[in-house]
């Protein structure tokens, strides 16, 4: 959520920045009218409350002097009724204004490339050598079937499309990657490991920005206040909702493994085969709470930690700075990390690393004090996938495939695979 004071003071500049996102600015124009109405109602209410206070004093004085106070009491009651009506109108206006503010996206940072499509995203760096096969690269979905490590057909029978059964070496590879990533982030990078709930309430989904705007993308548990988590970012960020932290606690870093659930609304017909776009998938997420002045330095750190996973797996990748139109609703700045997929001849997203500045913290009321008696300030929150596990499996299958249809296990994963070096059919 954007600071309402900042929105008033820098309205034109903020409107211009949001226009670069390609956003409909109707809500911005409604904000002006609603904010003026709110301030007008507050002013009227304060005047009437002052009149009521004066009337109360006058009535007390009349009674002390044993004079008739009926007329003054009637007048005070009328003022009281007017105050009550204005308070109710003010509550309605503030509720509408708050809902409107919840629907306005974050303000892009000045360093974000201005663009209108994904073609305007800027490649920052390419890392690693792409494999040079002397055979035609096989798509990972065909490799999975040939190696019998994933069962899509039975998952479709049991549940539906965009679900899989991992089996045998496939299940072990998925589990190995989760353990490898969590060990790396905890043991080397100093994160505290979190295993979060897989359901969260509406306040949590609102705090991190999924609600109210993107409710159709979420899986809601019918007749409850619960949603299945679309990412561990939601429960982990909301761990500190409505809390005031101390400065010496910051930065806080959590690494969380969770299953994630997404409806993939709007993705009909896209990536219908393979592991790229599933309704249920595993992911390791990094979440950081930091001081405002440190958040952009921390974004570089976080992105580097996500990259480290790919470097250790020796998977070629590129890092992009996402343009204004491709930032997502909550981010002030975002890097995407894309891994090379030989069968398609393209890079595919495997991680997003974002700085939300105080956008989520303001929604979730996550603050800190620099000193014991200092005024609380909003923290800055960041998160990044490190990594999406199913997509990492897909990348390993494609980049480590052999001419005979087998797949070599990356060396760093072999201790997690019981020493297995090759998956064979």
From Swiss-Prot:
Residues holding L-serine: 231-233, 285, 385
Record text on subunit structure and interactions: Homodimer. The tRNA molecule binds across the dimer.
Catalytic activity: tRNA(Ser) + L-serine + ATP = L-seryl-tRNA(Ser) + AMP + diphosphate + H(+); tRNA(Sec) + L-serine + ATP = L-seryl-tRNA(Sec) + AMP + diphosphate + H(+)
Lineage per the UniProt record: Bacteria, Bacillati, Bacillota, Bacilli, Bacillales
Biological or metabolic pathway of the protein: Aminoacyl-tRNA biosynthesis; selenocysteinyl-tRNA(Sec) biosynthesis; L-seryl-tRNA(Sec) from L-serine and tRNA(Sec): step 1/1
Protein name (record): Serine--tRNA ligase
Family named by the database record: Belongs to the class-II aminoacyl-tRNA synthetase family. Type-1 seryl-tRNA synthetase subfamily.
Keywords: Aminoacyl-tRNA synthetase, ATP-binding, Cytoplasm, Ligase, Nucleotide-binding, Protein biosynthesis
Gene: serS
